């Protein structure tokens, strides 16, 4: 037989005439995690425990009020209240919307500090004093 003799209609039928079916069902991992939930400045600390790949758990921060600020001169950490977000190199819009990400400059009770942790991944805000 010649290959040109076969009529190939839509992609819903096989050359034998049988129906084409779904190869596999949609897996949860293929759907993705949805839009990013970036931690915001809030009235108090809000954390969420989520199941992640491999059945592990991850503590994510949704809202933050306090940060662990490292004071280089005294070589110690201080739990300080976050007053505001000064700037965010990752995205200038984040500072206006009060999003806290790694690298953001925050104003605390003890002075300005740079966030060194990833709050959305670690569930805690660690920062180093720059003033």
UniProtKB/Swiss-Prot annotation:
It holds the Pfam family Ribosomal_S8e. It comes from Pyrobaculum neutrophilum (strain DSM 2338 / JCM 9278 / NBRC 100436 / V24Sta). It comes from the Archaea. This is Small ribosomal subunit protein eS8. Belongs to the eukaryotic ribosomal protein eS8 family. Residues 16-30 have a biased composition (Basic residues). Residues 1-37 are annotated as: Disordered. GO terms for cellular component: ribonucleoprotein complex; ribosome.
């Amino acid at each position: 037989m010649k290959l040109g003799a076969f009529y190939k209609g839509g992609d819903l039928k096989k050359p034998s005439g049988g129906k084409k079916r779904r190869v596999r069902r949609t897996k949860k991992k293929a759907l993705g995690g949805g839009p990013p939930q970036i931690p915001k400045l809030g009235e108090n600390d809000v954390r969420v425990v989520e199941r992640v790949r491999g059945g592990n758990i991850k503590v994510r921060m949704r809202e933050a009020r306090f940060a662990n600020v490292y004071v280089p001169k005294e070589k110690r950490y201080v739990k300080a209240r976050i007053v505001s977000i000064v700037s965010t190199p990752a995205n200038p819009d984040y500072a206006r919307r009060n999003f806290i990400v790694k690298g953001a400059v925050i104003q605390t009770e003890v002075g300005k500090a740079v966030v060194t942790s990833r709050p959305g991944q670690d569930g805690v805000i660690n920062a180093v004093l720059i003033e």
